[in-house]
């Protein structure tokens, strides 16, 4: 996030009128993790498919139309997708034709993975020149109607969405040797990634064999389009519509050989960083209106001195027995640095967990000198003495506390282990992604990687895998720097008094750097204003002031999307909010409203399912083939899974150890045939290459030499190198300890104050235009840290930033705001 601190704080000029250089704020720290707009696999929206890829190697063969035995009765022949993209929605019409090779009546099952931002709003099934259209009914009625129809020899389809996000429906009594065509309408929220809007069809949606495929995408945006790209498939055709000011375009692609990679369309529009975009959709079906608003602000014009935002920081530290020794020492040191990097606009707290958990405060407290001293005392007592690794109880304690949208909650989790019921834990935190962003650190080689990645991705955060303790603090501070980047929080849409709306989502997640806001709303009545309506997007800006972005809704320019995509996604998000209220046990009965929305817009929900039934013209007399469905392996991680992972890790470690031991063994066998001089040369040469973990083994083998002089020299060289390495490490540790001592003396406001005893400061050299000893002391300490610890810059970036900001505030108070650079240069002469 910061440029080189020496470039920031020092100017080439030494005159008293020097203007200090400030650091522009950007999302460069985030881009180190997610790359550019083409790195779609690092985008938040792709996490659902990432989980599919990691868990199920064979899933690709289970999607589509199958029999319950998962055999090759049905085969996809033709597949066409017609999509339309606007600012906030993507509507896709699927047409799939399957051949049916069964010689007897068969019951099939159709499944596809459905991302959490997508909904099925309609489906039909065709065979024998008949068309069966799905209708939404209450879940109980749909199930009963399906069972009755099948029992009487009729055709029936029952569709539901499973808990793991798969849309599926059973098709009963399909006649033999009759082709089947399935039509789906899928409406998705557009997938924003950095400055782009994306549309992704994962390869798991397509069978792993050849079929005819056609993809047509129609793009209609409210802003001009800069670029359009289709990854992996260069033989696509892109055309911009004439007289559309580059706001409309089409993309087409076809294949005779099926699909072997993800289909990812990336559209980059021009960005209006000051004005949210809006769409007003009119539904001809029932003469209603829906609105969507999207906004991707940029704060790149701000400097680090401008940022003065509120936030809540909670740190959850693994204190199980496996963290003993160097890991817990490093964690404590990192915590001491982090808590000095916070500012007085923050709330903060620390949790320690193992078989049980403790916390510094009952609830997060405001950051000041008193609470900083209290929590620093808590950190000093932290040790790896809490037993096992039970992560769910402390996370539940944190997330069950209602978040304050004025202080966006950011949770940092540091662990080196595994947990039981991992996937249940990840699914739980995902339900709180609207109010909490999670950063995770995985320590060492035995940590459950999917736990670390899954927790962060579920809450749109970031993660670090820390394999080497030597870079511990640096890697920790990388994520902390991201947490400090500009944020728009406490966001609300002021719809004014003319519009009666129902908004989804009701509570808007804080808008972090590089993210896009999307909000939907249904107008509650059909009466609309004759003219434009002014509404506004309001939030707390990164400078600490309220920001307001005007939005003009012009009802003379409504759009009639054929599939009511804006209406549908508005209803979908409202249903999610209502279901979430019930999940949290607020004793609200929202069933009637959920069923009403589900039936109006064709949405599967907690209380609604799709059902299609039709009486057969000829009742099927043969026995319908009934086959056992292949059981999908459970997605829940259990203790046995953890044990298996440990066994695999132990096996790998043992094999590596044996392999290296064999290398050393072979070395000394070959040395038996060499002269003493050759032995000296060969042993010393190879010693430098072997892993340090084998040092004792090497010493043992070297003792087998027939010559005591050779043995003594080899062991002596070995010991000298070990001693040299220890001295080097001790030097680094001592340097780090002295830096930490300086950092721990910093006050909550960023200053270092008198009396200061860490090193001698001559207060008599303080310039006359400075009225406070603390200003002079702080300037000198800044110089001291920059000068003495250049290799540890990433650790103290935020600490120095806070200190310099405090000094500049004091200089502004003294009416000398432009003298920061010259005073810093002067103070450098006195360190």
From Swiss-Prot:
Record Pfam families: VIT, VWA_3
Source organism superkingdom: Eukaryota
InterPro entries: VIT, VWF_A, vWFA_dom_sf
Residue stretches spanning the membrane: none
Domain VIT: 60-188
SUPFAM superfamilies in the record: vWA-like
Domain VWFA residues, every copy: 312-480
Protein name (database record): von Willebrand factor A domain-containing protein DDB_G0285981
SMART domains, per the entry: VIT, VWA
Lineage: Eukaryota, Amoebozoa, Evosea, Eumycetozoa, Dictyostelia
